[in-house]
């Protein structure tokens, strides 16, 4: 009896002490915003391996179209990936490389019929072949972080089937008659008659191989799931002995003659719609001087086991909006695009880790012994983050970089 009374007495006295042991001090929203803005300033410079902002130079009157094209493609790709992750309830990988990646765009080469060259595409009823020249990037083979193949699917109102499953293959160099001639990469179900859309495929392994072995670069093959039969995507049913042609049409691959034979007005309209939608590769490379820093000091992974489902209540931990205007908030003129972005931040109260009705003094004592400098109550921190693409100038040289973990999308108590 005396033991129970003593335990209760100690518990009531130790719990308030535990609740006060927090390294997360209460700040007003203005102070949160100021700290977040300064943190972003340091983040951007750090990720670009800059000790200070580049010197101010007069902004160019007009950014070259090819530079804008790379920026737009990279930005759109990131937005598409974010939308897919949100739809699938997936999170960005927490072990994303910290430093910024340089982005390069390689368009599919176009050859005139009169040129004595192998055309980059071949028309076949059941597949298309696409080739890229990546020889200029061979010296950077070891720095490749990611490669994406992007192709724009055109609307085909004359398609005989509404849906098709298309597959992407890497064409292999055959050593003998028994060796495989292609390697599967990915597949997508597309709506042939729907409005056009960009399709993206992760081709990092294939491009990495091409950069190290030039003779193995035989291109990609876009084909039907089963050209010798008919595949019904809605129920994964295959109808044998019924050939199905590739009804999906792709900008820069399928000629305008597919849509109009002799109709100059329609040909001109189609060319206008497909302008700027050439199939291309987006290569993301980590420069050597950043690669060395990345290998020497890896960031710690964010803990994922302490996630807290926060409520959207003003006083509780939740996502707070914060728009950063580079010129107004940071005093920077050297970032050309975007002019600003929604950085956001996390703030609010978190429920305490211990309470008098769920924990005992021995547990609290053990925790404090193991983690003497740790907070006894959780803090509101970021959980899901997304990258940001920027276009900036160093002198007269335009550069496009992808900065990881710059946009806070959700929060947790940890």
From Swiss-Prot:
GO molecular function terms noted in the UniProt entry: amyloid-beta binding; growth factor activity; protein homodimerization activity; signaling receptor binding; transforming growth factor beta receptor binding; type II transforming growth factor beta receptor binding; type III transforming growth factor beta receptor binding
Gene Ontology biological process terms in this record: activation-induced cell death of T cells; ascending aorta morphogenesis; atrial septum morphogenesis; atrial septum primum morphogenesis; atrioventricular valve morphogenesis; axon guidance; blood vessel development; blood vessel remodeling
Keyword Secreted among record annotations: yes
Any single GO CC term annotated in Swiss-Prot or TrEMBL for this entry: extracellular region
InterPro entries, A to Z: Cystine-knot_cytokine, TGF-b_C, TGF-b_propeptide, TGF-beta, TGF-beta-rel, TGFb2, TGFb_CS
Keywords: Cleavage on pair of basic residues, Disulfide bond, Extracellular matrix, Glycoprotein, Growth factor, Mitogen, Secreted, Signal
Glycosylation sites: 72, 140, 241
Disulfide bonds, paired cysteine numbers: 309-318, 317-380, 346-411, 350-413
SMART domains (alphabetical): TGFB
Superkingdom classification of source: Eukaryota
Position of the signal peptide: 1-20
Family: Belongs to the TGF-beta family.
PANTHER family: TGF-BETA FAMILY, TRANSFORMING GROWTH FACTOR BETA-2 PROPROTEIN
Subunit structure: Interacts with the serine proteases, HTRA1 and HTRA3. Interacts with ASPN. Interacts with MFAP5.
Record's protein name: Transforming growth factor beta-2 proprotein
Taxonomic placement: Eukaryota, Metazoa, Chordata, Craniata, Vertebrata
């Amino acid at each position: 009896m005396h033991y129970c009374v003593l335990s209760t007495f100690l518990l009531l006295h130790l719990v308030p002490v535990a609740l006060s042991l927090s390294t997360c001090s209460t700040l007003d929203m203005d102070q949160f915003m100021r700290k977040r803005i300064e943190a972003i300033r340091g983040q951007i410079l750090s990720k670009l391996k800059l000790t200070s902002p580049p010197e101010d130079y007069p902004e160019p009157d007009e950014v070259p179209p090819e530079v804008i094209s790379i920026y737009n493609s990279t930005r759109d790709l990131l937005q598409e990936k974010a939308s897919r992750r949100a739809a699938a309830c997936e999170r960005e990988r927490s072990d994303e490389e910290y430093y910024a990646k340089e982005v390069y765009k390689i368009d599919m080469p176009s050859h005139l019929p009169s040129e004595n060259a192998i055309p980059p595409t071949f028309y076949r009823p059941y597949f298309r072949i696409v080739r890229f020249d990546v020889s200029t990037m061979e010296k950077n083979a070891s720095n490749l972080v990611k490669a994406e193949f992007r192709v724009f699917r055109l609307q085909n109102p004359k398609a005989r089937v509404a849906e098709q499953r298309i597959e992407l293959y890497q064409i292999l160099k055959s050593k003998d008659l028994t060796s495989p001639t292609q390697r599967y990469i990915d597949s997508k179900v597309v709506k042939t008659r729907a409005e056009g859309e960009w399709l993206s495929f992760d081709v990092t392994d294939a491009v990495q191989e091409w950069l190290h072995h030039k003779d193995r670069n035989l291109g990609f093959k876009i084909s039907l799931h089963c050209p010798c039969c008919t595949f019904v995507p809605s129920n994964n049913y295959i109808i044998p002995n019924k050939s199905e042609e590739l009804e999906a049409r792709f900008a820069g691959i399928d000629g305008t003659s597919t849509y109009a034979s002799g109709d100059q007005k329609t040909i001109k309209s189609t060319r206008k719609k497909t302008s700027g939608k050439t199939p291309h590769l987006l290569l993301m490379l980590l420069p050597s001087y950043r690669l060395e820093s990345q290998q020497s000091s890896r960031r710690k992974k964010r803990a994922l086991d302490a996630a807290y489902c926060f409520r959207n209540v003003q006083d509780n931990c939740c996502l707070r909006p914060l728009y950063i205007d580079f010129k107004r908030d940071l005093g920077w003129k050297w970032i050309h695009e975007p002019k600003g972005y929604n950085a956001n931040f996390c703030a609010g109260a978190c429920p305490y880790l211990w309470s008098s009705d769920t924990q005992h003094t021995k547990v609290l004592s053990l925790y404090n012994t193991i983690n003497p400098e740790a907070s006894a109550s959780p803090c509101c921190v970021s959980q899901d983050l997304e990258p940001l693409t920027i276009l900036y100038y160093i002198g007269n040289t335009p550069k496009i970089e992808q900065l990881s973990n710059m946009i806070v999308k959700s929060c947790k108590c940890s």
